[in-house]
Amino acid sequence: MSGIDFKQKISFQRPFSKPIEAEEEYDIVRQFESDRGRIVNSAAIRRLQQKTQVFPLERNAAVRSRLTHSMEVQQVGRHIAKEILNRFKQDGRVDALGLTKLLDPFESIVEMACLMHDIGNPPFGHFGESAINNWFSQRLDPASCGSEPASNDRCQVSALRLHEGESDLNRLRSRIRHDLSHFEGNAQAIRLVHTLLKLNLTYAQVGCILKYTRPAYWASDIPASHNYLMKKPGFYLAEEAFVDRLRRELNMGEFDRFPLTYIMEAADDISYCVADLEDAVEKNIFTVEQLYQHLTQEWGEVTPGDLFDKTVASAFRKIAHGGARRSSEDQFFMYLRVFTVARLVPHAAQRFIDNLEAVYQGNFNQALLEDSSPAYQLLKIFKNVAFKHVFNHPEVEQLELQGYRVISGLLDIYSPLLAMPLADFTLLVQEDSHRAYPIETRLFHKLSTKHRLAYIEAIEGLQHLSPEQLAIREYYFRARLLQDYISGMTDLYAYDEYRRLMAAE
């Protein structure tokens, strides 16, 4: 393990700043304290308070939003990081691993990645993602994209249809059709912090939220060596050049992951599994007693001293012998969380250490908590019960269907902007008005300033291209403009905006 040197990974350089020199420990710490301030004060973090965790449009403040969930993940991530660093200290390896001046940054990077891990999620969570992807797939038909034009190509955008004898342009068209049809919250998070909000975070901090490592346009087979790391899109074509720079700065291979990302992922896994069940009890989907029966059934035979006995059964015994029944739900989940975290955090930390070489290189092709251990089995039964009894609940499904309709409907409403000819849309952007397009003008006025500026900046960088390339790439960034705007809405704003524009109120 002589090749492990975290100084080569924990970079405090920033993409929009001159090279930073920092030799003293506190000078390094200051860079990551600056990251913390930029992140905590960003609008994207504030919007998480009105984005769903499991129950969309929830008015009960006791039920988790994305923000409260992210704060819980932040705490578990901090705990895992401290556990890892303490074990390095006990083994006398801190200096050998290049961590002497980086203990606080190590912890801070994990914490802030945990806080940010959901900022790219659209309204209504995964159903919002599906709505965006299905809407664009129906119009761009990425499945028909090959190296040559297809007779059954159903792409509705003329600039993106494949043409004979235009192999280079066809490759670009194909990539863009795939890219726009694979919206993903993790990829949108990279776009948010770098392109839209321009937080100018350190490379290490951004690297820690690059959870998946393939571009959204990827249409080839996924190599078996990275099939877990590449199972979802991690960034868009628009951010590809930045991700290339980030990989060079952090000494990451093409499809490899930043090492501290594994900790963020484990913290999320530990947090949401218990939280989703607690929210379900708060929503009266089942009682604690019914939940205990569901969990016992999923686990199978319980033996004294096994992990189920030390966590779930132990928490249930605490309330069975407790006092006032009216607080039994709170008591049960407090104990369940404490007992689960106490067992799973050390397990995640040890997995990080046991696989340190692969984790450091970023090619450890699984999650820290994805193994054959009782810890993994415990997480799996939490997930199974949530899938069978929470996510399939009629109230949840009804709200998800509403969310799907809201996002699809908003894309329909704003779609006239995508149908405008390039010259006319350019005039609309430049003049902030177009007399021949009164509806489109009013729709354009509703787009937020930061999203419009991101579009303008992207287009200014395309003026050297041929007319054919310009038409292709301009459509891409115009579509990104709509995806950015709608995905940045909160659940409630999207719902209200849809009702207003449909004249439903």
UniProtKB/Swiss-Prot annotation:
Pfam families: HD. Residues 66-273 form the HD domain. Its EC number is 3.1.5.1. It is an enzyme of class 3 (hydrolase). One of its GO terms (molecular function) is dGTPase activity. Its cofactor is Mg(2+). It catalyses: dGTP + H2O = 2'-deoxyguanosine + triphosphate + H(+). SMART domains: HDc. Gene3D superfamilies: Hypothetical protein af1432 (1.10.3210.10), putative deoxyguanosinetriphosphate triphosphohydrolase like domain (1.10.3410.10). GO terms for biological process: dGTP catabolic process. Disulfide bonds: none annotated. InterPro entries: dGTP_triP_hydro_central_sf, dGTPase, dGTPase-like, dNTPase_1, HD/PDEase_dom, HD_domain. Keywords: Hydrolase, Magnesium. dGTPase preferentially hydrolyzes dGTP over the other canonical NTPs. PANTHER family: DEOXYGUANOSINETRIPHOSPHATE TRIPHOSPHOHYDROLASE, DEOXYNUCLEOSIDE TRIPHOSPHATE TRIPHOSPHOHYDROLASE. Belongs to the dGTPase family. Type 1 subfamily. Homotetramer. This is Deoxyguanosinetriphosphate triphosphohydrolase.
